[in-house]
């Protein structure tokens, strides 16, 4: 909350009950017993509070303009908070200024009695109602501009070069978390946002808070997809943009469904966003998960097809022919190299949601580890390399299982590979 906004509340909250208890205030607190002087004394007493509202409201507006220049969600929420307070408080001030004048007192005299304190200090401008009206319009304008600026920020995907980039570790983008935070808080300001959208010029297509929130979320998801589509990637990193989308879409859909771990909020969020958008994003999340696996861990399975029909032994011997030995070498070497590359890539990636991370790890392990174990058991004892059998048997089934399960945990390949399986770079094309 803005500091100036905090200062605005005490005097403003005192105005409404003061208005309701004008006679008691004038009679018992101010010592005025004549009904003819009730209004005059009352208005003179509350003039400092009205003046304080105007002064602190103006100060809050200056502070707000500085805070909302970067279109951050906290600045937008502060603008809505202040506009909502102005919507509630300033009409009370205006009503106070419109109280009927007492008999026998000229309007000009009454205005002077309100605008000058006993110590001679100027309290209100010569046109206090115009001051209040102008302040309310400025507060409304600042809040409306903050709504427009944030929607533009989201539609552009952020600012500068980063607006076209995915996060380096494929994690949830900061704009995703801030937009979801804004969505949750927008529900609290729904009457105020509806009021702003109904009374300001239609720079925004949305006619309600719900339409605005849905539009911002749609624009943000589109910008995420655009980032992923334009991400420069090599073969081993082809799955990273899909992990990025999966992380972000999962964050959006799971928090809409759970309401940030609050069931009443979840029900309101789902109604606010709508089942139509939620279904689309859940489906997109599943598609990106499938594509992520197809371009990463599933590629390992291509090296584990059973090559028995293609293997031939040398005549009169159980040793493999040169060509058959090369078949097994290519399979083990291809698997080892790709596993190493994928592990290096995904050690640098992050999956912040523990449930999603466990799901991805378990699925990769269940697909690859059993098939590699069978392949290893069947062919690791076959002498397909004269000098460098250990080079091709670099990873044991336990190593592979560990690599798959530590893929997002920052464990290096050197820490996992068995020491006795160190590489030997010498050539070995002959089996004898």
Please report, for each region that a protein language model flagged, where it lies by residue.
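Long alpha-helical rod scaffolds of large eukaryotic non-enzymatic complex subunits
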Residues: 1-432
């Amino acid at each position: 909350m803005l500091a100036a906004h905090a200062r605005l509340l005490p005097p403003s909250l005192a105005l409404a009950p003061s208005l309701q208890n004008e006679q008691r205030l004038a009679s018992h607190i101010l010592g005025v017993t004549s009904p003819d002087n009730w209004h005059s004394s009352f208005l003179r007493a509350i003039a400092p509070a009205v003046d304080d509202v105007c002064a602190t409201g103006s100060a809050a507006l200056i502070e707000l303009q500085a805070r909302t220049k970067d279109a951050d969600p906290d600045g937008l929420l502060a603008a809505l908070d202040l506009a909502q307070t102005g919507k509630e408080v300033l009409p009370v001030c205006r009503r106070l200024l419109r109280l009927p004048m007492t008999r026998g007192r000229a309007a000009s005299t009454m205005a002077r009695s309100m605008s000058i304190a006993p110590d001679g200090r100027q309290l209100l401008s010569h046109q206090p109602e115009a001051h209040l009206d102008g302040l309310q319009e400025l507060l409304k304008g600042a809040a409306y501009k903050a709504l427009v600026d944030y929607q533009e920020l989201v539609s552009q995907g952020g600012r500068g070069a980063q607006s076209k980039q995915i996060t380096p570790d494929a994690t949830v983008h900061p704009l995703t978390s801030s937009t979801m935070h804004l969505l949750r808080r927008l529900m609290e300001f729904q009457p105020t946002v509806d009021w702003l959208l109904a009374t300001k010029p239609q720079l925004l297509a949305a006619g309600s808070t719900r339409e605005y929130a849905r539009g911002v979320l749609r624009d943000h998801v589109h910008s995420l997809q655009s980032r992923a589509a334009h991400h420069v990637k090599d073969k081993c990193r082809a799955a990273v943009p899909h992990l990025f989308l999966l992380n972000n879409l999962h964050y959006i859909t799971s928090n809409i469904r759970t309401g940030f771990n609050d069931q009443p909020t979840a029900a309101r969020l789902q109604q606010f966003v709508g089942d139509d958008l939620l279904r689309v994003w859940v489906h997109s999340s599943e598609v990106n998960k499938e594509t992520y696996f197809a371009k990463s861990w599933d590629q390992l399975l291509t090296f584990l097809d059973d090559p028995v029909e293609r293997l031939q032994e040398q005549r009169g011997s159980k040793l493999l022919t040169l060509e058959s030995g090369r078949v097994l070498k290519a399979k083990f070497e291809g698997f080892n190299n790709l596993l190493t590359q994928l592990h290096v890539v995904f050690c640098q990636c992050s999956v912040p949601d523990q449930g999603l991370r466990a799901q991805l790890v378990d699925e990769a392990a269940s697909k690859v580890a059993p098939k590699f174990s069978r392949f290893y058991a069947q062919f690791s004892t076959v002498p397909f390399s004269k000098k460098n059998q250990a080079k091709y048997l670099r990873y044991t089934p336990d190593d592979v299982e560990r690599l798959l399960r530590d893929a997002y945990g920052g464990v290096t390949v050197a820490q996992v590979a068995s020491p006795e399986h160190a590489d030997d770079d010498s050539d070995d094309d002959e089996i004898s």
